[in-house]
Regions:
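ABC family nucleotide-binding domain
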Residues: 2-130, 134-136
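C-terminal boundary and immediately downstream tail of ABC-type ATPase nucleotide-binding domains
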Residues: 140-171
């Protein structure tokens, strides 16, 4: 699931979700649509199945992209900065869906700068810089006692930005 949604603009939401299960997995339209409707209900988008992507908010499009991927019954889901292109108000609804998937035991690889979310949902953190793995470990270890200078610098900068924003709001 990518940050740019990759929905087909000329197809309604139901058709966007059911295309791959019908064409790739050779599932019947009836079966694919029934599952798509169940998945849309899980992400609170039942009323959008006949809508086109241009009619949806960024958060809604991202949830449709997640549903489309889930309709293929993946063993592993890759989320590549799925909240990067969203307004702050829309980020929460997408992260809630991913959190629910985590609680259901779906294996996920999540590329994100949403550090508090990563800390809450991850079994393992892999910190990368310029395409290289700098550090890897359990979330609590990474966030409380990073092993590398690069990870410490990154976290210190993140904490500084978070404190600055908090101070601006209280002023």
């Amino acid at each position: 699931v990518f940050q740019s949604y990759e929905l087909f603009p000329h197809m309604n939401i139901l058709d966007n979700i059911t295309l791959a299960p019908r064409k790739v997995q050779k599932r019947s339209r009836k079966e694919a649509e029934a599952e798509a409707r169940e998945l849309l209900a899980r992400v609170n988008l039942s009323d959008k199945e006949k809508s086109y992507p241009r009619m949806l908010s960024g958060g809604q499009k991202q949830r449709v992209a997640i549903v489309r991927a889930l309709a293929m019954h993946p063993e592993l889901m890759l989320f590549d900065e799925v909240t990067a292109a969203l307004d702050p108000e829309m980020v929460r609804e997408v992260l809630d869906v991913i959190m629910e998937l985590s609680e259901q035991g779906l294996t996920m690889l999540i590329v994100t700068h949403e550090l508090s979310f990563a800390r809450a949902v991850a079994d393992r953190i892999v910190f990368m810089d310029e395409g290289r793995v700098v550090e890897s470990g359990k979330p609590e270890e990474f966030f409380t006692a990073p092993k590398t200078e690069r990870a410490r610098t990154f976290l210190d900068n993140f904490r500084f930005v978070a404190r600055s924003r908090k101070e601006e709001k209280s002023a």
